[in-house]
């Protein structure tokens, strides 16, 4: 327990060690188990890590002491197993790790171990605070300062830090830098007073070295004093930020120093646990993959931004690189007109300003950069950030910026330095100054109208209340009028439109007469309809383009003209079918006659059925324009078709009688089967006509019975021969 207290003084307190002295074995085991579990819960993300032990707790047949021993062994085994899995993954992936160099000019105070972070939030929800170990990939915020960490624990972390995998290393470092506790107000005031004294001394030295900038340095010193009074009057917010900034530099320099401590690690002992931890790392990488991809391009752009800034202020940086404390003061003591002071904090817990130093992309996204310094007041520039490693330029580094902005409670970040020339052209996600303007569109249409022959006209005044508020000369109307002018010009030059104009002038009188005739036309006689239709077509067929010519005559009844044409075409078609059927010649042979009549019947049958379905609607439309079409022609067509089928049956019976006479005279007929098939075919056609017409007349009914009797009484016919 004393060893655990030395390694983890935040978890295993001294009071617990004293309480165990003189206690019985069961109580000591309980204390020991609780401390082991608290240590494991502080850095192991899996809440069931104890149950992964090979020791299975079973109280069957065991006393209390044995069960306590099993609990302790399970906790130890689970802790060792989880640690071995984590370190095994780190050993195998450490071969591809890049070396890091320690920047010059870092004070000795910066060369120390990382500060521990708490496992839970600042709301004291955690029961077991713990030091940060390599197992923590995404630890929570800190609960204690780094002063409580023992030196032995620092050494242990320094050794374990080098075992981190590249994925864990990036997240581990950024979480440490982002989650720092606020220092006390008294310590911050003392640190700022010392920084002010050193800044004054530094200003005096610069004044002696360079007489050209003496006036500017004096003004800078006076401004620093004013800024200090302003910070003290505004509260502890700015003081806490200055202290955190200084400690952020120290922590980052120590992080880089720890990276170059060890480079050779044996990975053979942990090869079996690699696959298990590899899946865990892949899950973590997948969890942050989207955020990393969103920020990686902007971060690389900002990296070049920082490099350009470092080159621009190289001379001034050399004078300010003696100590990290003086660097922080130089950043905070710049004049107001150069770098605006940070806004007041909204909560006592603030993220470290170091984040803005290493990840200026986050600050650019949260607030606009300050204006460049004026020529009259050139303040000392802040020192450039330490060289950024390739690992810190990855997506996980950028992912921290998103976490920082989310969990920081709207805390301000470090103001970004002024951008060097040409550095902002590649910032993809920066706020653009480009805006859409309706004036450009209006100007375009106005110029287009001017080029098409219309002058530029200003906007009309808004109409008063109750009047039309639409502008008389809007861009759309100007464009339409321009198109009309262009069309008119094309019309004048086109021979086609010239011919149309000639037709208008030539047939104007005939069209006017036709116009009045169509308006007054009404009839019930279909012959009169056909005659009037022919007269109209004889005039209109002479026009080059009927639509274009008639459009020149206002009030021409085009709709009634279309109705007259429809009625005339319909009646003409029905009358043509009727005439064709009446003039149909009934001539032998029967097979050829049936072939022709069946083809024609199938052709007009569908047309007649369509007219019957729509005749009621057509009759209403025709009557609206004083045209009463006679649909009795449909009945005439059906009756005529029945007469044609009756004639076919008579021809079939006639051929049957001739065949019987030949048989009586002793002449054997060689076409008995063919005659039988012709009888059956004539009967089938008669039945189709019966279905189409809806009935038979007396003549057709009598012939159908006779034909059926002949088919039934024919001794030479069989069912198979007829059906074949």
UniProtKB/Swiss-Prot annotation:
Biased composition (Low complexity): 323-333, 347-366
Keyword Manganese included in the entry's annotation: no
UniProt feature, compositional bias: Acidic residues: 193-212
Source taxonomy: Eukaryota, Viridiplantae, Streptophyta, Embryophyta, Tracheophyta
Coiled-coil annotated spans: 187-217, 495-522, 649-678
Biased composition (Polar residues): 115-128, 400-410
Composition-biased stretches (Basic and acidic residues): 223-252, 309-322
Region (Disordered): 97-131, 187-252, 309-434, 454-473
Protein name per Swiss-Prot or TrEMBL: Uncharacterized protein At4g04980
PANTHER family with a match to the protein in the record: HYDROXYPROLINE-RICH GLYCOPROTEIN FAMILY PROTEIN (PTHR31342:SF32), PROTEIN CHUP1, CHLOROPLASTIC (PTHR31342)
Keyword Coiled coil tagged: yes
Matches recorded under InterPro entries: CHUP1/IPGA1-like (IPR040265)
Keywords, ordered alphabetically: Coiled coil
UniProt feature, compositional bias: Pro residues: 367-388
């Amino acid at each position: 327990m004393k060893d655990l207290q030395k390694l983890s003084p935040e978890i295993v307190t001294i009071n617990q060690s004293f309480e165990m002295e003189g206690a019985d074995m069961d109580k000591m085991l309980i204390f020991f188990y609780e401390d082991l579990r608290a240590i494991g819960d502080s850095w192991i993300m899996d809440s069931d890590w104890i149950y992964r032990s090979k020791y299975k707790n079973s109280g069957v047949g065991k006393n209390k002491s044995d069960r306590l021993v099993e609990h302790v062994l399970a906790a130890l085994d689970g802790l060792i197993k989880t640690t071995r899995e984590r370190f095994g993954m780190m050993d195998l992936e450490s071969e591809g790790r890049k070396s890091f160099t320690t920047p010059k000019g870092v004070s000795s105070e910066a060369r120390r171990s990382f500060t521990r972070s708490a496992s839970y939030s600042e709301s004291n929800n955690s029961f077991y605070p713990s030091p940060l170990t390599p197992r923590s990939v995404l630890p929570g915020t800190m609960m204690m300062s780094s002063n409580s960490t023992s030196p032995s624990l620092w050494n242990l972390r320094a050794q374990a830090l080098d075992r981190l995998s590249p994925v864990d290393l990036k997240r581990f470092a950024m979480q440490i830098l982002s989650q720092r506790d606020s220092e006390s107000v008294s310590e911050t005031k003392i640190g700022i007073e010392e920084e002010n004294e050193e800044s004054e001394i530094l200003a005096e030295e610069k004044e002696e070295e360079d007489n050209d900038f003496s006036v500017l340095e004096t003004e800078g010193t006076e401004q620093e004093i004013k800024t200090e009074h302003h910070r003290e009057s505004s509260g502890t917010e700015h003081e806490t930020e200055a202290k955190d900034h200084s400690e952020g530099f120290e922590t980052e320099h120590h992080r880089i120093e720890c990276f170059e401590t060890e480079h050779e690690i044996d990975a053979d002992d942990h090869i079996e646990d690699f696959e298990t931890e590899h899946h865990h790392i892949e899950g973590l990488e997948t969890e942050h993959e989207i955020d990393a991809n969103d920020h990686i391009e902007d971060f690389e752009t900002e990296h070049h931004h920082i490099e350009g800034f470092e080159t621009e202020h190289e001379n001034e940086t050399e004078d300010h690189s003696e100590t990290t404390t003086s660097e922080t003061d130089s950043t905070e003591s710049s004049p107001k007109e150069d770098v605006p002071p940070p806004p007041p904090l909204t909560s006592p817990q603030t993220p470290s300003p170091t984040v803005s130093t290493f990840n200026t992309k986050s600050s650019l996204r949260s607030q606009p950069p300050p204006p460049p310094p004026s020529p009259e007041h050139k303040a000392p520039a802040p020192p450039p950030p330490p060289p950024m490693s390739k690992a810190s330029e990855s997506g996980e580094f950028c992912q921290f910026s998103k976490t920082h902005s989310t969990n920081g409670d709207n805390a301000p970040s470090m103001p970004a330095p002024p951008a060097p020339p040409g550095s902002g052209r590649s910032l993809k996600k920066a706020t653009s100054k480009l805006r859409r303007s309706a004036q450009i569109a209006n100007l375009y249409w106005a110029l287009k109208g001017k080029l098409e022959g219309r002058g530029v006209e200003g906007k009309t005044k808004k109409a008063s209340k109750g009047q039309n508020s639409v502008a008389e000369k809007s861009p759309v109307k100007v464009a339409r009028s321009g198109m009309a002018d262009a069309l008119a010009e094309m019309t004048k030059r086109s021979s086609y439109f010239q011919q149309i104009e000639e037709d208008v002038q030539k047939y104007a009188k005939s069209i006017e007469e036709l116009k009045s005739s169509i308006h007054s036309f009404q009839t019930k006689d279909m012959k009169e309809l056909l005659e009037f239709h022919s007269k109209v077509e004889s005039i209109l067929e002479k026009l080059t383009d009927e639509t274009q010519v008639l459009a020149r005559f206002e009030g021409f009844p085009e709709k009634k003209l279309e109705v007259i044409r429809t009625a005339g075409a319909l009646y003409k078609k029905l009358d043509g079918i009727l005439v064709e059927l009446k003039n149909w010649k009934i001539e032998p042979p029967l097979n050829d006659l049936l072939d022709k009549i069946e083809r024609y019947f199938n052709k007009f049958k569908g047309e007649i059925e369509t007219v019957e379905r729509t005749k009621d609607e057509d009759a209403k439309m025709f009557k609206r324009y004083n045209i009463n079409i006679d649909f009795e022609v449909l009945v005439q067509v059906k009756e005529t078709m029945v007469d044609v089928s009756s004639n076919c049956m008579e021809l079939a019976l006639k051929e049957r009688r001739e065949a019987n006479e030949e048989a009586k005279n002793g002449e054997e007929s060689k076409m008995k089967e063919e005659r039988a098939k012709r009888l059956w075919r004539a009967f089938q056609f008669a039945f189709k006509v019966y279905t189409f017409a809806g009935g038979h007349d007396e003549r057709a009914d009598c012939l159908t019975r006779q034909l059926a009797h002949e088919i039934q009484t024919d001794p030479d016919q069989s069912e198979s021969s007829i059906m074949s």
